[in-house]
From Swiss-Prot:
First-listed, main subcellular location of the protein, grouped into a coarse class: membrane
Organism: Escherichia coli O7:K1 (strain IAI39 / ExPEC)
GO-annotated molecular function: transmembrane transporter activity
Name listed for the protein in its UniProt record: Putative multidrug resistance protein MdtD
Gene name linked to the record: mdtD
InterPro entries, sorted: EmrB-like, MFS, MFS_dom, MFS_trans_sf, Multi-R_MdtD
Highest rank taxon of the organism: Bacteria
């Protein structure tokens, strides 16, 4: 990329900065949840909605981000994304109640939903085709550093300042990024087809109300009748979308995607698989602090081996899948992640804390292999005219399933625990033990889906071609 103009390199730095902000925010909050709960007068068992409100908003808004960028311009939308994300961070820091914090996190989610896909679109428009891969590697590298720094930085800020600072640090960075975007980024636009607003609203309503219903009386305090009403509304909305999308060439996501068997299996497996694995980044720092008494900073440091394992495995996942095939790799990693989850709880309850970093490193390796394999299996056989739509649907499902996973984890804690965590450490650890065993069971379930994947090892070279675009 050394032969690119200086203006283009600056634009790539702006996109990289956006990737870093978004990835940092997805991990920095987890370590601070117990401190937030204490400050806001809430039970730590109910703080999962701080994560869900952000991730669910990202899932809902993702389908509209690319169309908005083409219609209004990448600079205008990227600038708007940074401003909304920064304002959301400010409102998060100023929140005095859990409900205020949830609304502020949703505003952050609107910005986060536009930042990454619009950033990818910007790179496609400003970089020559032959240098696109190198440019994407450059801008996504900070996005890999974010999860590495997030948990430890969050713990450090909570322990030596307050949880408010995990949001306040975004403000000066966001202001600089917004100004740089206006000054340096070109406002590319493209001719767009008519946006499927009806389909977008039906999907948004379906996803939001079903997730809210899943949280149920334990989290939101809704009556059984209200929960039943939400379920009915959500199911009707999704059924109406299917009817709307049938034989509709302008649908948000064409039903023709599901004619490709590997896409259907991969999408179903990704949805179920990320429900289970989405619980782990939320539950691990909460358990380390509440169940084992770790400090926020110590709990944050314990998450680093998991990220390192994930980053290290990405270098060899292509060879692993090419050697053993998608079906074997996905079944093995799914069952392996379930076993590693139980191993983590066992070593923690036995007091073998020195073993935990190695277990978390192994968890990161297994999870990374499974993620990359799921992504590429889903997209590898799609025809070119459906590849973009399939990738967008996969991105939405990834965010939705993670929000559902965190919701289920919070629900399990509520079922096995009480309104407030007991001062008896033995009781608290029992609550987490039952929750962890339930999580291990849920994590193992997608193996039944992956067992139906065709044994097509000779086609697995596709992973090296599509891996980066799918992640």
């Amino acid at each position: 990329m050394t032969d690119l103009p200086d203006s283009t390199r600056w634009q790539l730095w702006i996109v990289a900065f956006g990737f870093f902000m978004q990835s940092l925010d997805t991990t920095i909050v987890n370590t601070a949840l117990p401190s937030m709960a204490q400050s806001l007068g809430e039970s730590p068992l109910h703080m999962h909605m701080v994560i869900v409100s952000y991730v669910l908003t990202v899932a809902v808004m993702l389908p509209a981000s690319g169309w908005l960028a083409d219609k209004v311009g990448v600079r205008n939308i990227f600038f708007t994304a940074i401003v909304l994300f920064t304002l959301g961070s400010l409102f998060c820091a100023l929140s005095g109640t859990l409900n205020e914090l949830l609304l502020a996190r949703a505003l952050q989610g609107v910005g986060g939903a536009m930042m990454v896909p619009v950033g990818r679109l910007t790179v496609m428009k400003i970089v020559p085709r032959e240098q696109y891969m190198a440019a994407m590697t450059f801008v996504t590298l900070p996005g890999q550093v974010g999860p590495l720094l997030g948990p430890a930085l969050g713990g450090l800020l909570v322990e030596y300042a307050s949880w408010h600072w995990i949001f306040l640090i975004n403000i000066p960075v966001g202001i600089i990024g917004a100004i740089a975007t206006l000054m340096l980024m070109p406002n590319y636009t493209m001719q767009t087809r008519r946006f499927d607003l009806s389909g977008f609203l039906l999907l948004a309503v379906g996803m939001a109300v079903l997730t809210l219903a899943l949280d149920g009386s334990k989290g939101t305090g809704l009556s059984p009748l209200a929960i039943a009403g939400l379920v009915a509304v959500g199911v009707v909305a999704l059924v109406l979308y299917l009817l709307h999308a049938r034989n509709n060439n302008r649908a948000l996501f064409s039903l023709k995607l599901f004619r490709t068997r590997t896409f259907s299996l991969g999408l179903a497996g990704s949805f179920a698989g990320r429900i289970g694995s989405g619980m782990l980044p939320f539950m691990t720092p909460v358990f380390l602090q509440i169940g084992l008494g770790f400090s926020p900073f110590h709990a944050g440091l314990m998450m680093i081996p998991m990220v390192l394992g994930s980053m290290g495995m990405k270098r060899i996942v292509v060879q692993v899948v090419n050697r053993f095939g998608y079906r074997r790799v996905l079944v093995a990693t799914t069952l392996g992640l379930s076993l590693v989850t139980m191993l983590f709880m066992t070593t923690a309850l036995l007091g073998w804390y020195y073993v935990l970093p190695f277990v978390l490193f192994l968890q990161g390796m297994v999870n990374s292999t499974r993620f990359s394999s799921m992504n590429t299996l889903t997209l590898k056989d799609l025809p070119d005219n459906l590849a973009s739509s399939g990738n967008s649907l996969l991105s939405m499902i990834m965010q939705l399933s993670m929000s559902i996973g965190v919701t289920i984890a919070g629900l399990l804690l509520g079922l096995f625990g009480s309104q407030h965590v007991s001062v008896d450490s033995g009781t608290t650890q029992t609550v987490f033990m039952y929750t962890w065993l339930s999580m291990a069971f849920i994590i193992a379930l997608p193996a039944f889906i992956f067992a139906r994947v065709p044994n097509d090892t000779h086609q697995n070279v596709a992973i090296s071609r599509r891996k980066r675009s799918a992640q």
